Amino acid sequence: MSELTIGILGGGQLGSLLCLGAKNLNIKTVIYCDDKDAPAQVYANDFIFGDYNDKEKIEYFIDKVDLVTYEFENIPFETLDLINQFKEVKPKPAINKIVQHRLYEKDFVNKCNISTTRYVSIKEKSDLNANIKLIPGLLKTCRLGYDGKGQYKLNNVSDLENLNIDFSQEYILEKMINLKKEFSIILTRFGHSIHSVYEPIENEHENQILKYSKIPADIDDKIVIKAKDWASIIADDLDYVGTICVEYFIDKNDNLYVNEIAPRVHNSGHLTINSYNISQFENHIRAICGLEKQELKKIYNAKMINIIGEEIVSYRSKKYSDNEFFFDYGKKEIKPNRKMGHLTIIQKG
């Protein structure tokens, strides 16, 4: 086994799959999580339960690892910055400062000369009234929120009358487009413009939660080239190391927009485990550990189904064929809209 030990902040399914990616390379892992029942602890070599603001526990974690990464981007910046003073954090904490805040993220993308949907900062009710041209639109909290949380759909101006939100938080209003398709580009950057880029993954959402992902995506070649170029520009401008996901919209006129950046491994990339020679998870570990880039090869076309809430019960009792791969996240409690597992179906022959 390698002498290297990676610390992973966060103990959900992405943490579990990162641990498995590290295990493929004989690299040890320590999970730090604020959930004592974190499912990733089963796959790690060691587990530390503690709050992300608990300095004493964080210092104990620092002593046990050689470098640190994370499975989700909403770790407090101060915690990442503290860790980075003693053990290198990859991707670097400064990146999180941008992508933790939706307005900063959109501003960054536009400064790269890359298109997003129209948007405006909202700090008070009068800002909404002054920007009705962006309605229909989505009002989102600038911080936190995922899978539709912290988002308010404004179909028309009259919806403003029924809006009851806390303006002590910052918001962003994004103009809705005539959506044709959503897809993601997952890229692993090894530094110095050395990239491994996975082919576009077409995504479908239900109730603002990812439900289906598939490769190949049914997307025009010109859009594919542009999307890969944009993802590479974003990764290079951030001086990113590791796996990153850029999510895209295509409108009815075939215009391309960046929706958001995920500075980590991504749900849509679960299918890379069974469809590529190297998964997004293993590639992330390779990059942050300074290992050389290996040639990426797609072996199979594939479809991934997210298993949400109570759906997991029936999936646990099913029998699967040799082209189906079921992954149960091992979460202790079943909750509505909670991602409980996934099924990947590969197309052989």
List the model feature ranges, each with a label.
Residues 1-95, 99-100, 104:
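ATP-binding N-terminal substructure of ATP-dependent carboxylate-amine bond-forming enzymes
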